[in-house]
Curated annotation (Swiss-Prot):
Species of the source: Vibrio cholerae serotype O1 (strain ATCC 39315 / El Tor Inaba N16961)
Helicase C-terminal domain boundaries: 245-390
Lineage: Bacteria, Pseudomonadati, Pseudomonadota, Gammaproteobacteria, Vibrionales
Protein name according to UniProt: ATP-dependent RNA helicase RhlB
InterPro entries: DEAD/DEAH_box_helicase_dom, DEAD_box_RNA_helicase, Helicase_ATP-bd, Helicase_C-like, P-loop_NTPase, RNA-helicase_DEAD-box_CS, RNA_helicase_ATP-dep_RhlB, RNA_helicase_DEAD_Q_motif
Similarity remark: Belongs to the DEAD box helicase family. RhlB subfamily.
Top-level lineage group: Bacteria
Length: 438
């Protein structure tokens, strides 16, 4: 959770329980973001909500605050065992579930409520032991939650609050049957507080809300533009021959504090990682086949600043809350227009500014018209000077040549490239575009 001061509304203005206010204020959260200011009065009145807001706007804190407050003000059902959750928060990815749990920790400490995680790719027995020690709030992905349910580790008879986060992403990943399976085993919608949040309130998302919620109020925070007004967008048209050199030259010119590079395939991501690691950049690789423990370690290194650049497929485009990402590079333009918005939305979050640089190369330039139509504006274009591109670049590393360097390279330097063997880049690759004649 990131401290923001975007509205004049304070959390203390809403009549929250003192323990909730205490947890928020100890982490420095005093003022609300727009989605928090709109959602909390609705939720605190007991009304269900279907909220639409871009990632990075503070919706996680909105539903966590409402969930904790609801559990504190609503008596637990009579006969409920400590192993039976009172609230359930469903997320589309393991990373998002973990991030929600981490964001909940200040409120767990101040309220005394217990939370547990349930997601695949992690030890079943370890999660089972945590659940058996008592749980008020269950946070996780639908598949593992259903596994525990079918093993009768818990039931859902005493659920008093439900959160469905990134609902549109749930549809994209094919989890809708799992969601309906879980909803049908909970108390009636009128007997629980229901919260749905989504980047888009599409027809299918609204249909889900109508089916499993109690007349939810729609709360929408529309951005001025789909891509966020704090994000500086830039587009290059590199040849396939120049593409990698342009990326490395721009990285050396921009020298980003924290950057994510997106490519469309696992193989392309591995190629980018190999070139940047060879050039002594502190770079991590995040693709779909990375084991969960390694994913968590890579993300922690990136968040802590031990890794400066993360190369990723769209597995990281949504559901990850990584603060202070300064640059996003679209090495490949995505095939899905919405993925462009979600990718560059990793930067320019919570009031910060960001820079997005995209390559319309020979292979993926065909995707550009649809993307620009979707975001309703043309992406500003820059030319580059081929003679200004770096040429003395080392050969790429072999991804599997060294177990120690697989997936992450934290041995690079922020102050020099290639161990100081190459002079710092002096020539700017950008070339001014000629002005159009009237």
């Amino acid at each position: 959770m990131k401290k923001t001061h975007i509205t004049e509304h304070k959390f203390a203005d809403f009549g929250l329980q003192p323990q909730v206010i205490d947890g928020l204020e100890k982490k420095g959260f005093v003022y609300c973001t727009p989605i928090q200011a709109l959602a909390l009065p609705v939720l605190l009145s007991g009304q269900d909500i279907a909220g639409q807001a871009q990632t990075g706007t503070g919706k996680t804190l909105a539903f966590l605050t409402a969930t904790f407050n609801h559990l504190l003000t609503t008596p637990a059902a009579e006969g409920r065992a400590e192993t039976q959750p009172r609230a359930i928060i469903m997320a589309p990815t393991r990373e998002l579930a973990i991030q929600i749990f981490n964001d909940a920790e200040p409120l767990l400490a101040s309220t005394g409520l217990k939370a547990a995680l349930a997601y695949g790719g992690e030890s079943y027995d370890k999660q089972l032991a945590k659940l058996q020690s008592g749980v008020d709030i269950l946070i996780g992905t639908t598949g593992r939650i259903i596994d525990f349910y079918k093993q009768r580790v818990f039931n859902l008879n005493h659920i008093q609050a439900v959160v469905l986060d990134e609902a549109d992403r749930m549809f994209d990943l094919g989890f809708i049957k799992d969601i309906r399976f879980l909803f049908r085993r909970m108390p009636e919608p009128k007997d629980r507080l229901n919260m749905l949040f989504s980047a888009t309130l599409s027809y299918r998302v609204q249909e889900l809300a109508f089916e499993h919620m109690n007349n939810p109020e729609h709360v929408v925070v529309e951005p001025e533009q789909k891509t966020g007004h704090r994000i500086q967008e830039e587009l290059f048209y590199p040849s396939n021959e120049h593409k990698m050199a342009l990326l490395q030259t721009l990285i050396e010119e921009e020298w980003p504090d924290r950057a994510i590079i997106f490519a469309n395939t696992k193989h392309r991501c591995e190629q980018i990682w190999a070139h940047l690691a060879a050039d002594n950049h502190r770079v991590g690789l995040l693709t779909g086949d990375v084991p969960q423990k390694k994913r968590e370690r890579i993300l922690e290194q990136f968040t802590q600043g031990d890794v400066d650049i993360l190369v990723a497929t769209d597995v990281a485009a949504r559901g990850l809350h990584i603060p202070q990402v300064t640059h996003v590079f679209n090495y490949d333009l995505p095939d899905d227009c919405e993925d462009y918005v979600h990718r560059i939305g990793r930067t320019g979050r919570a009031g910060a500014s960001g820079h997005s640089i995209s390559f319309a190369c020979e292979e993926y330039a065909i995707n550009l018209p649809a993307i620009e139509s979707y975001i309703e504006h043309a992406i500003p274009t820059s030319d580059y000077d081929p003679s200004a591109l770096l040429t003395d670049l080392p050969a790429p590393l072999s991804l599997r040549s060294s177990p120690q360097q697989r997936r992450t390279n934290t041995a690079g330097s922020r102050n020099s490239n290639n161990g100081g063997n190459r002079k710092p880049q002096q020539r700017r690759p950008r070339a001014p575009r000629p002005k159009k004649e009237a």
